[in-house]
Amino acid sequence: MNTIAPDHYKTESGLQVWDVTRYMSGNMAQAFQYVYRAGRKGNEAEDLRKAVAFLEDWVAHPDVPRAVLPEGIEPTDGPSVGGCLLLDIPDGSQWKVQPLMQIISADSYEGEAMNGQPFCGRRLITNETLPRLKKRIAELGGVDG
């Protein structure tokens, strides 16, 4: 283990969480990291509660800028690296894949959803991601749910 890049943030193929989060906004990067490491270090429910707090703060502050990508970095770069990172998630943690992809999408995409309606990342997080994480916390014996 390297203290700068601990094992609970790495995959067996060598990808690290920061390969996905480096261009994300602060709250969303923190939420992604806590969901990713949940069950890999310490108390899973506690990590998920921290992720929920960061997501709720992000939803509550629409005035804060979303991910800002430097010139030459495409919006699809983070999600494609994210997809590769998520391929390495072990079978017992597959429940994480959808919330992690939703966090990436909500932070990095603006435009239309597949149904032609405007895409709203905050609605996605509020209606799908947060309930899913709170349900998982409740399943672990936490109080959320």
What do these predicted ranges mean?
Residues 1-145:
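Intrinsically disordered, low-complexity regulatory regions
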